[in-house]
Regions:
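ER/secretory pathway lumenal C-terminal domains and tails of membrane proteins involved
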Residues: 4-158, 165-238, 250-467
Protein backbone atom coordinates (compact mmCIF):
# COMPACT_ATOMS: atom_id res chain seq x y z
CA UNK A 1 0.00 0.00 0.00
CA UNK A 2 1.27 3.47 -0.90
CA UNK A 3 2.26 5.51 2.16
CA UNK A 4 -0.26 8.14 1.08
CA UNK A 5 -3.05 5.54 1.44
CA UNK A 6 -2.36 4.74 5.09
CA UNK A 7 -5.47 5.33 7.17
CA UNK A 8 -5.63 6.66 10.68
CA UNK A 9 -7.39 4.42 13.22
CA UNK A 10 -10.24 6.31 14.87
CA UNK A 11 -13.42 5.61 16.85
CA UNK A 12 -16.79 6.55 15.38
CA UNK A 13 -20.11 7.08 17.15
CA UNK A 14 -23.48 6.34 15.57
CA UNK A 15 -26.69 8.30 16.13
CA UNK A 16 -27.56 6.12 19.12
CA UNK A 17 -24.26 6.87 20.86
CA UNK A 18 -22.68 3.46 20.20
CA UNK A 19 -18.97 3.54 19.36
CA UNK A 20 -17.05 1.30 17.00
CA UNK A 21 -13.55 1.29 15.50
CA UNK A 22 -12.88 2.59 12.01
CA UNK A 23 -10.35 4.29 9.80
CA UNK A 24 -10.21 7.89 8.69
CA UNK A 25 -9.34 8.19 4.98
CA UNK A 26 -6.48 10.45 3.97
CA UNK A 27 -6.79 13.46 1.72
CA UNK A 28 -5.15 11.43 -1.05
CA UNK A 29 -7.77 8.69 -0.62
CA UNK A 30 -10.54 11.26 -0.84
CA UNK A 31 -9.02 12.67 -4.02
CA UNK A 32 -8.78 9.22 -5.58
CA UNK A 33 -12.40 8.53 -4.66
CA UNK A 34 -13.45 11.84 -6.19
CA UNK A 35 -11.65 11.17 -9.47
CA UNK A 36 -12.35 7.46 -9.84
CA UNK A 37 -15.94 7.30 -8.61
CA UNK A 38 -17.58 10.71 -8.60
CA UNK A 39 -15.97 12.03 -11.79
CA UNK A 40 -15.18 8.90 -13.81
CA UNK A 41 -17.92 6.46 -12.81
CA UNK A 42 -20.70 8.94 -12.07
CA UNK A 43 -20.10 11.39 -14.92
CA UNK A 44 -17.78 10.29 -17.71
CA UNK A 45 -19.41 6.87 -17.81
CA UNK A 46 -22.77 8.52 -18.51
CA UNK A 47 -21.17 10.89 -20.98
CA UNK A 48 -19.71 7.97 -22.92
CA UNK A 49 -23.06 6.16 -22.88
CA UNK A 50 -24.41 8.94 -25.06
CA UNK A 51 -21.49 9.45 -27.40
CA UNK A 52 -19.54 6.16 -27.53
CA UNK A 53 -21.91 3.32 -26.59
CA UNK A 54 -23.59 1.55 -23.70
CA UNK A 55 -23.08 -2.00 -22.48
CA UNK A 56 -26.66 -2.56 -21.20
CA UNK A 57 -29.36 -0.85 -19.16
CA UNK A 58 -28.73 -2.82 -15.97
CA UNK A 59 -27.63 -0.55 -13.12
CA UNK A 60 -23.88 -0.70 -12.68
CA UNK A 61 -22.27 -0.84 -9.26
CA UNK A 62 -18.75 -1.44 -10.53
CA UNK A 63 -19.25 -4.86 -12.15
CA UNK A 64 -17.55 -5.63 -15.45
CA UNK A 65 -20.79 -6.80 -17.04
CA UNK A 66 -23.32 -4.17 -15.95
CA UNK A 67 -23.89 -0.59 -17.04
CA UNK A 68 -20.45 0.28 -18.44
CA UNK A 69 -19.69 2.36 -21.51
CA UNK A 70 -18.44 0.58 -24.61
CA UNK A 71 -17.52 1.53 -28.16
CA UNK A 72 -18.59 -1.46 -30.24
CA UNK A 73 -14.96 -1.89 -31.30
CA UNK A 74 -13.99 -5.34 -29.93
CA UNK A 75 -10.31 -4.81 -29.15
CA UNK A 76 -11.10 -1.67 -27.13
CA UNK A 77 -14.05 -3.14 -25.23
CA UNK A 78 -12.29 -6.45 -24.55
CA UNK A 79 -9.26 -4.62 -23.19
CA UNK A 80 -11.46 -2.72 -20.72
CA UNK A 81 -13.90 -5.41 -19.56
CA UNK A 82 -12.77 -8.77 -20.91
CA UNK A 83 -14.07 -10.72 -23.90
CA UNK A 84 -17.56 -9.34 -24.47
CA UNK A 85 -18.50 -12.26 -26.71
CA UNK A 86 -18.49 -14.50 -23.63
CA UNK A 87 -21.33 -12.59 -21.99
CA UNK A 88 -24.64 -14.49 -21.78
CA UNK A 89 -27.19 -13.78 -24.49
CA UNK A 90 -29.45 -12.01 -22.01
CA UNK A 91 -26.78 -9.31 -21.71
CA UNK A 92 -25.64 -9.31 -25.33
CA UNK A 93 -29.24 -8.91 -26.54
CA UNK A 94 -30.24 -6.41 -23.86
CA UNK A 95 -32.22 -3.56 -25.41
CA UNK A 96 -29.90 -1.09 -23.73
CA UNK A 97 -26.89 -2.56 -25.56
CA UNK A 98 -26.03 0.33 -27.91
CA UNK A 99 -22.87 0.76 -29.96
CA UNK A 100 -22.01 4.08 -31.62
CA UNK A 101 -18.36 3.26 -32.45
CA UNK A 102 -17.44 6.62 -30.86
CA UNK A 103 -18.70 8.43 -33.97
CA UNK A 104 -20.70 11.09 -32.06
CA UNK A 105 -17.72 11.57 -29.72
CA UNK A 106 -15.29 12.05 -32.60
CA UNK A 107 -17.65 14.42 -34.39
CA UNK A 108 -18.09 16.44 -31.20
CA UNK A 109 -14.33 16.71 -30.62
CA UNK A 110 -13.89 17.87 -34.21
CA UNK A 111 -16.51 20.56 -33.60
CA UNK A 112 -14.88 21.56 -30.30
CA UNK A 113 -11.48 22.20 -31.88
CA UNK A 114 -13.05 23.74 -34.96
CA UNK A 115 -14.78 26.32 -32.78
CA UNK A 116 -11.79 26.94 -30.51
CA UNK A 117 -9.44 27.67 -33.43
CA UNK A 118 -11.63 30.04 -35.42
CA UNK A 119 -10.00 33.22 -34.25
CA UNK A 120 -10.97 35.55 -31.43
CA UNK A 121 -14.69 35.28 -32.12
CA UNK A 122 -14.49 31.49 -32.17
CA UNK A 123 -12.63 31.45 -28.85
CA UNK A 124 -15.32 33.60 -27.21
CA UNK A 125 -18.02 31.29 -28.53
CA UNK A 126 -16.04 28.26 -27.38
CA UNK A 127 -15.89 29.50 -23.79
CA UNK A 128 -19.65 30.11 -23.75
CA UNK A 129 -20.35 26.52 -24.82
CA UNK A 130 -17.60 25.15 -22.58
CA UNK A 131 -18.97 26.76 -19.43
CA UNK A 132 -22.46 25.55 -20.32
CA UNK A 133 -20.94 22.08 -20.68
CA UNK A 134 -19.01 22.38 -17.41
CA UNK A 135 -21.68 23.96 -15.24
CA UNK A 136 -24.30 21.37 -16.24
CA UNK A 137 -21.86 18.47 -15.90
CA UNK A 138 -18.75 18.40 -13.75
CA UNK A 139 -19.91 21.34 -11.64
CA UNK A 140 -22.97 19.29 -10.66
CA UNK A 141 -20.62 16.44 -9.71
CA UNK A 142 -18.83 18.82 -7.33
CA UNK A 143 -22.12 20.06 -5.91
CA UNK A 144 -23.80 16.67 -5.38
CA UNK A 145 -20.80 14.93 -3.74
CA UNK A 146 -22.47 11.57 -4.41
CA UNK A 147 -21.95 8.53 -2.20
CA UNK A 148 -21.45 4.98 -3.52
CA UNK A 149 -24.32 2.59 -4.27
CA UNK A 150 -26.83 5.14 -5.52
CA UNK A 151 -30.40 3.78 -5.68
CA UNK A 152 -30.53 4.36 -9.44
CA UNK A 153 -28.41 5.57 -12.34
CA UNK A 154 -28.04 9.37 -12.26
CA UNK A 155 -27.39 10.15 -15.93
CA UNK A 156 -30.47 12.39 -16.08
CA UNK A 157 -28.76 14.87 -13.76
CA UNK A 158 -26.26 15.77 -16.48
CA UNK A 159 -28.58 16.04 -19.48
CA UNK A 160 -27.71 19.72 -19.91
CA UNK A 161 -24.05 18.83 -20.31
CA UNK A 162 -24.88 16.34 -23.05
CA UNK A 163 -26.95 18.98 -24.83
CA UNK A 164 -23.95 21.31 -24.73
CA UNK A 165 -21.71 18.65 -26.27
CA UNK A 166 -24.35 18.16 -28.98
CA UNK A 167 -23.64 21.78 -30.01
CA UNK A 168 -20.08 20.73 -30.76
CA UNK A 169 -21.37 17.73 -32.71
CA UNK A 170 -23.34 20.13 -34.89
CA UNK A 171 -20.22 22.28 -35.33
CA UNK A 172 -18.36 19.09 -36.26
CA UNK A 173 -20.58 18.77 -39.31
CA UNK A 174 -19.81 22.41 -40.14
CA UNK A 175 -16.09 21.63 -39.79
CA UNK A 176 -16.35 18.69 -42.19
CA UNK A 177 -18.22 20.88 -44.67
CA UNK A 178 -15.51 23.55 -44.40
CA UNK A 179 -12.70 21.05 -44.95
CA UNK A 180 -14.51 19.34 -47.82
CA UNK A 181 -15.06 22.71 -49.46
CA UNK A 182 -11.32 23.42 -49.30
CA UNK A 183 -10.48 20.02 -50.79
CA UNK A 184 -13.16 20.24 -53.48
CA UNK A 185 -12.94 23.90 -54.39
CA UNK A 186 -14.40 23.30 -57.83
CA UNK A 187 -17.27 21.21 -56.51
CA UNK A 188 -18.88 23.04 -53.59
CA UNK A 189 -22.15 21.14 -54.01
CA UNK A 190 -20.36 17.80 -53.66
CA UNK A 191 -18.59 19.07 -50.52
CA UNK A 192 -21.90 20.09 -48.98
CA UNK A 193 -23.43 16.73 -49.91
CA UNK A 194 -20.58 14.78 -48.29
CA UNK A 195 -20.85 16.77 -45.06
CA UNK A 196 -24.62 16.29 -45.04
CA UNK A 197 -24.27 12.52 -45.50
CA UNK A 198 -21.89 12.30 -42.54
CA UNK A 199 -24.17 14.54 -40.51
CA UNK A 200 -27.12 12.25 -41.19
CA UNK A 201 -25.37 8.87 -40.88
CA UNK A 202 -24.20 9.46 -37.30
CA UNK A 203 -27.65 10.21 -35.82
CA UNK A 204 -29.15 7.42 -37.94
CA UNK A 205 -26.67 5.00 -36.38
CA UNK A 206 -27.62 6.29 -32.94
CA UNK A 207 -31.37 6.04 -33.47
CA UNK A 208 -31.03 2.53 -34.93
CA UNK A 209 -29.37 1.46 -31.68
CA UNK A 210 -31.52 3.30 -29.17
CA UNK A 211 -35.01 3.15 -30.69
CA UNK A 212 -35.94 -0.06 -28.89
CA UNK A 213 -34.64 1.24 -25.54
CA UNK A 214 -37.70 3.40 -25.04
CA UNK A 215 -40.53 1.04 -25.91
CA UNK A 216 -42.92 1.25 -22.97
CA UNK A 217 -45.70 -0.84 -24.52
CA UNK A 218 -47.19 -3.62 -22.39
CA UNK A 219 -45.51 -2.33 -19.24
CA UNK A 220 -48.38 -2.19 -16.78
CA UNK A 221 -46.69 -3.05 -13.49
CA UNK A 222 -46.67 0.51 -12.11
CA UNK A 223 -50.18 1.20 -13.30
CA UNK A 224 -51.50 -2.04 -11.81
CA UNK A 225 -49.77 -1.51 -8.49
CA UNK A 226 -51.27 1.97 -8.24
CA UNK A 227 -54.75 0.64 -8.98
CA UNK A 228 -54.33 -2.17 -6.45
CA UNK A 229 -53.25 0.27 -3.74
CA UNK A 230 -56.36 2.37 -4.34
CA UNK A 231 -58.70 -0.61 -4.58
CA UNK A 232 -57.33 -1.85 -1.26
CA UNK A 233 -59.17 1.01 0.44
CA UNK A 234 -62.80 0.69 1.60
CA UNK A 235 -65.52 2.06 -0.65
CA UNK A 236 -67.03 4.32 1.99
CA UNK A 237 -65.72 7.12 4.17
CA UNK A 238 -63.38 8.92 1.72
CA UNK A 239 -60.33 6.95 2.91
CA UNK A 240 -56.83 8.39 3.16
CA UNK A 241 -53.64 6.54 2.20
CA UNK A 242 -50.24 7.88 3.26
CA UNK A 243 -47.37 7.31 0.85
CA UNK A 244 -43.77 8.46 0.88
CA UNK A 245 -41.59 9.48 -2.04
CA UNK A 246 -42.27 9.58 -5.75
CA UNK A 247 -42.26 5.95 -6.87
CA UNK A 248 -45.07 4.81 -4.59
CA UNK A 249 -47.15 7.97 -5.13
CA UNK A 250 -47.15 8.74 -8.86
CA UNK A 251 -48.81 5.43 -9.92
CA UNK A 252 -51.71 6.26 -7.61
CA UNK A 253 -51.95 9.79 -8.94
CA UNK A 254 -51.93 8.47 -12.51
CA UNK A 255 -54.83 6.13 -11.78
CA UNK A 256 -56.86 8.93 -10.22
CA UNK A 257 -56.00 11.71 -12.67
CA UNK A 258 -56.03 9.73 -15.94
CA UNK A 259 -58.22 6.68 -15.41
CA UNK A 260 -60.53 8.13 -12.76
CA UNK A 261 -59.89 5.27 -10.33
CA UNK A 262 -61.08 5.83 -6.77
CA UNK A 263 -61.29 9.59 -6.90
CA UNK A 264 -63.04 9.42 -3.52
CA UNK A 265 -59.76 8.38 -1.88
CA UNK A 266 -57.08 10.89 -0.91
CA UNK A 267 -53.42 10.12 -1.54
CA UNK A 268 -51.22 12.01 0.93
CA UNK A 269 -47.48 12.07 0.27
CA UNK A 270 -45.64 12.37 3.58
CA UNK A 271 -42.52 13.74 1.88
CA UNK A 272 -44.53 16.71 0.65
CA UNK A 273 -46.56 17.09 3.84
CA UNK A 274 -43.52 18.76 5.39
CA UNK A 275 -44.23 21.78 3.14
CA UNK A 276 -46.86 24.47 3.52
CA UNK A 277 -48.04 24.46 -0.11
CA UNK A 278 -48.87 20.75 0.00
CA UNK A 279 -50.65 21.13 3.32
CA UNK A 280 -52.74 23.81 1.61
CA UNK A 281 -53.72 21.27 -1.05
CA UNK A 282 -54.63 18.64 1.53
CA UNK A 283 -56.99 21.11 3.23
CA UNK A 284 -58.96 21.50 -0.01
CA UNK A 285 -61.39 18.98 -1.56
CA UNK A 286 -60.20 17.08 -4.64
CA UNK A 287 -62.56 15.31 -7.05
CA UNK A 288 -64.86 13.21 -4.82
CA UNK A 289 -62.56 13.41 -1.80
CA UNK A 290 -63.28 15.66 1.14
CA UNK A 291 -60.54 17.87 2.64
CA UNK A 292 -58.26 16.15 5.10
CA UNK A 293 -59.16 16.85 8.76
CA UNK A 294 -56.47 19.49 9.30
CA UNK A 295 -57.90 22.29 11.43
CA UNK A 296 -54.80 24.48 11.55
CA UNK A 297 -54.92 27.86 9.89
CA UNK A 298 -52.14 28.54 7.43
CA UNK A 299 -50.46 30.89 9.90
CA UNK A 300 -49.45 27.94 12.09
CA UNK A 301 -47.71 25.87 9.43
CA UNK A 302 -46.38 28.45 6.98
CA UNK A 303 -42.82 27.52 6.06
CA UNK A 304 -40.80 30.06 8.02
CA UNK A 305 -38.64 27.57 9.91
CA UNK A 306 -40.57 27.89 13.18
CA UNK A 307 -43.17 25.27 12.31
CA UNK A 308 -41.09 22.48 10.78
CA UNK A 309 -39.93 20.68 13.91
CA UNK A 310 -41.54 20.21 17.33
CA UNK A 311 -39.32 19.03 20.21
CA UNK A 312 -40.58 16.53 22.76
CA UNK A 313 -40.12 17.78 26.34
CA UNK A 314 -41.45 15.23 28.85
CA UNK A 315 -40.11 17.32 31.73
CA UNK A 316 -43.32 19.37 31.36
CA UNK A 317 -45.52 16.42 32.39
CA UNK A 318 -45.91 17.90 35.86
CA UNK A 319 -47.68 20.86 34.29
CA UNK A 320 -50.16 18.51 32.59
CA UNK A 321 -50.74 16.59 35.81
CA UNK A 322 -51.48 19.84 37.62
CA UNK A 323 -53.97 20.82 34.92
CA UNK A 324 -55.70 17.48 35.33
CA UNK A 325 -56.02 18.02 39.07
CA UNK A 326 -57.50 21.46 38.59
CA UNK A 327 -60.00 20.31 35.96
CA UNK A 328 -60.66 16.55 36.09
CA UNK A 329 -63.12 16.80 33.19
CA UNK A 330 -60.31 17.76 30.80
CA UNK A 331 -57.61 15.28 29.85
CA UNK A 332 -54.49 17.37 29.09
CA UNK A 333 -52.83 14.25 27.63
CA UNK A 334 -55.49 14.10 24.91
CA UNK A 335 -53.80 14.54 21.53
CA UNK A 336 -56.21 17.23 20.36
CA UNK A 337 -55.59 19.21 23.58
CA UNK A 338 -51.81 18.93 23.19
CA UNK A 339 -52.00 20.07 19.57
CA UNK A 340 -54.26 23.03 20.30
CA UNK A 341 -52.52 24.31 23.44
CA UNK A 342 -48.84 23.38 23.06
CA UNK A 343 -48.00 22.53 19.46
CA UNK A 344 -50.03 25.08 17.52
CA UNK A 345 -48.02 28.15 18.52
CA UNK A 346 -47.06 31.23 16.54
CA UNK A 347 -43.43 31.02 17.64
CA UNK A 348 -43.17 27.25 17.29
CA UNK A 349 -44.61 24.71 19.69
CA UNK A 350 -43.53 21.53 21.44
CA UNK A 351 -44.89 18.32 22.95
CA UNK A 352 -44.91 18.53 26.78
CA UNK A 353 -45.09 14.74 27.12
CA UNK A 354 -43.63 11.58 25.60
CA UNK A 355 -47.03 9.88 25.33
CA UNK A 356 -50.44 11.08 24.18
CA UNK A 357 -53.92 9.57 24.05
CA UNK A 358 -56.61 9.60 21.38
CA UNK A 359 -60.22 9.05 22.39
CA UNK A 360 -61.93 6.29 20.42
CA UNK A 361 -65.38 6.82 18.93
CA UNK A 362 -66.56 3.23 19.28
CA UNK A 363 -69.67 3.64 17.17
CA UNK A 364 -67.63 5.15 14.33
CA UNK A 365 -65.16 2.26 14.55
CA UNK A 366 -68.00 -0.26 14.26
CA UNK A 367 -69.64 1.57 11.34
CA UNK A 368 -66.33 1.92 9.49
CA UNK A 369 -66.20 -1.80 8.83
CA UNK A 370 -62.89 -2.13 10.65
CA UNK A 371 -62.01 -5.67 11.69
CA UNK A 372 -62.63 -6.13 15.44
CA UNK A 373 -60.27 -8.86 16.70
CA UNK A 374 -62.36 -9.80 19.75
CA UNK A 375 -65.74 -8.27 18.93
CA UNK A 376 -67.32 -4.92 19.82
CA UNK A 377 -66.44 -5.19 23.49
CA UNK A 378 -62.72 -5.24 22.63
CA UNK A 379 -62.72 -1.66 21.35
CA UNK A 380 -60.61 0.41 23.78
CA UNK A 381 -61.73 3.74 25.18
CA UNK A 382 -58.42 5.38 24.32
CA UNK A 383 -55.49 4.84 22.02
CA UNK A 384 -52.12 5.51 23.68
CA UNK A 385 -49.33 6.71 21.38
CA UNK A 386 -45.77 6.62 22.67
CA UNK A 387 -43.42 9.37 21.49
CA UNK A 388 -40.38 7.94 23.27
CA UNK A 389 -38.87 6.43 20.14
CA UNK A 390 -39.10 9.75 18.28
CA UNK A 391 -37.60 11.55 21.27
CA UNK A 392 -34.64 9.16 21.44
CA UNK A 393 -33.94 9.17 17.71
CA UNK A 394 -34.58 12.77 16.69
CA UNK A 395 -35.57 14.65 19.84
CA UNK A 396 -38.98 15.57 18.48
CA UNK A 397 -41.43 15.31 15.62
CA UNK A 398 -41.35 16.83 12.15
CA UNK A 399 -44.31 18.62 10.67
CA UNK A 400 -45.42 15.72 8.46
CA UNK A 401 -45.62 13.46 11.53
CA UNK A 402 -47.51 16.12 13.48
CA UNK A 403 -49.98 16.46 10.61
CA UNK A 404 -50.70 12.72 10.79
CA UNK A 405 -51.53 13.22 14.48
CA UNK A 406 -53.66 16.24 13.62
CA UNK A 407 -55.73 14.16 11.20
CA UNK A 408 -55.97 11.27 13.63
CA UNK A 409 -57.14 13.58 16.42
CA UNK A 410 -59.88 15.23 14.37
CA UNK A 411 -61.08 12.43 12.08
CA UNK A 412 -62.93 10.92 15.07
CA UNK A 413 -62.45 7.46 13.49
CA UNK A 414 -65.02 8.30 10.82
CA UNK A 415 -62.45 8.45 8.04
CA UNK A 416 -60.35 5.32 7.35
CA UNK A 417 -56.60 5.99 7.32
CA UNK A 418 -53.99 3.73 5.78
CA UNK A 419 -50.21 3.53 5.50
CA UNK A 420 -48.80 2.24 2.21
CA UNK A 421 -46.79 -0.98 2.53
CA UNK A 422 -43.89 0.79 0.85
CA UNK A 423 -43.39 3.16 3.78
CA UNK A 424 -40.09 2.74 5.57
CA UNK A 425 -40.06 1.76 9.25
CA UNK A 426 -39.37 5.36 10.26
CA UNK A 427 -42.46 6.77 8.54
CA UNK A 428 -45.22 5.34 10.72
CA UNK A 429 -45.11 8.21 13.24
CA UNK A 430 -45.05 5.74 16.13
CA UNK A 431 -48.25 4.02 14.98
CA UNK A 432 -46.61 0.73 13.93
CA UNK A 433 -48.26 -1.30 16.69
CA UNK A 434 -51.71 -0.08 15.68
CA UNK A 435 -51.49 -1.02 12.00
CA UNK A 436 -53.19 -4.02 10.37
CA UNK A 437 -52.34 -5.06 6.82
CA UNK A 438 -55.37 -5.03 4.53
CA UNK A 439 -54.37 -5.82 0.97
CA UNK A 440 -51.51 -3.47 0.07
CA UNK A 441 -51.91 -0.99 2.91
CA UNK A 442 -51.77 -0.92 6.69
CA UNK A 443 -54.93 0.36 8.32
CA UNK A 444 -54.55 2.52 11.41
CA UNK A 445 -56.70 1.02 14.17
CA UNK A 446 -57.21 1.73 17.89
CA UNK A 447 -55.99 -1.79 18.75
CA UNK A 448 -52.42 -2.22 20.01
CA UNK A 449 -51.08 -5.45 18.50
CA UNK A 450 -47.48 -4.92 19.61
CA UNK A 451 -46.36 -4.90 15.97
CA UNK A 452 -47.70 -4.42 12.45
CA UNK A 453 -49.82 -7.46 11.61
CA UNK A 454 -51.85 -8.73 8.68
CA UNK A 455 -55.61 -9.14 8.52
CA UNK A 456 -55.13 -12.79 7.47
CA UNK A 457 -52.96 -13.44 10.53
CA UNK A 458 -55.59 -11.94 12.83
CA UNK A 459 -58.38 -14.03 11.33
CA UNK A 460 -56.26 -17.18 11.62
CA UNK A 461 -55.47 -16.35 15.26
CA UNK A 462 -59.14 -15.70 16.03
CA UNK A 463 -60.12 -19.01 14.43
CA UNK A 464 -57.55 -20.88 16.52
CA UNK A 465 -59.09 -19.48 19.71
CA UNK A 466 -62.38 -21.18 18.89
CA UNK A 467 -60.98 -24.59 17.94
Amino acid sequence: MCIRDRFKDVTFSDKDGNTYPGQMPTQWSNLKFFLSYQVNFMYWRYFMWNFAGRQNDIQGLGELEHGNWITGIPFIDNAMYGDQSLLPKTLQENKGHNVFYCLPLILGLIGLFFQAYRGEKGVRQFWVVFFLFFMTGLAIVLYLNQTPSQPRERDYAYAGSFYAFAIWIGLGVAALASWAEKLLKSKPQLAAALASVVGVLVPLQMVSQTWDDHDRSNRYTCRDFGANYLNTLPDKGCPVIFTNGDNDTFPLWYNQEVEGTRTDARVCNLSYLQTDWYTDQMRRPAYDSKPLPITWSRYYYVDNGKHSYYPIRPEHKAELDELKKQNPKVDPYELSYILDHYVKKAEGGYFPTDSVVVSVNKQAVIESGMYLPMGKDSIPDKMIISLKNAQQKQGGLYRNEVMIYEMLAHADWKRPMYMSVTLGPGNYAGLDNYCVLEGLAYRITPFNYGQTVSYTHLRAHETSLHL
